[in-house]
């Protein structure tokens, strides 16, 4: 999972999408955000695929 950070915004390679998920919860009401760039991101559950880590499509 390789990302590039430009001005506090992480971008991916042109053919990649930034995928983040907030489904992992080790403690109640404390979601752990998992994010990274991937070639194959599937939007299922609470996962979202975006062009940047701010999730603007």
Swiss-Prot record:
Keywords: Blood coagulation cascade inhibiting toxin, Disulfide bond, Hemostasis impairing toxin, Secreted, Toxin
Gene Ontology terms: cellular component: extracellular region
Family: Belongs to the three-finger toxin family. Short-chain subfamily. Orphan group XX sub-subfamily.
Originating species: Hemachatus haemachatus (Rinkhals)
Broad class of where this protein is predominantly found: secreted
Cell compartment(s), UniProt: Secreted
Ligase is among the record's keywords: no
Pfam families the record matches: Toxin_cobra-type (PF21947)
GO molecular function, one term: toxin activity
Tissue distribution: Expressed by the venom gland.
Additional observations: Negative results: does not show activity on procoagulant, anticoagulant and fibrinolytic serine proteases such as FVIIa, FXa, FIXa, FXIa, FXIIa, alpha-thrombin, kallikrein, activated protein C (APC), plasmin, urokinase, and tissue plasminogen activator. Does not induce hemolysis.
The protein, known as: Exactin
Disulfide bonds: 3-19, 12-37, 41-49, 50-55
Keyword Secreted carried by entry: yes
General function of this protein: Anticoagulant protein that prevents the activation of factor X (F10). It acts by potently inhibiting the extrinsic tenase complex (ETC) (IC(50)=116.49 nM), a complex composed by active factor VII (F7a), tissue factor (TF) and F10. In addition, it shows weaker activities on other complexes. It weakly inhibits F10 activation by inhibiting the intrinsic tenase complex (IC(50)=4.05 uM), a complex composed by active factor IX (IXa, F9a), its cofactor factor VIII (VIIIa, F8a), and their substrate F10.
InterPro entries cross-referenced by the UniProt entry: Snake_3FTx, Snake_toxin-like_sf, Toxin_cobra-type
Domain of life: Eukaryota
Gene3D superfamilies: CD59
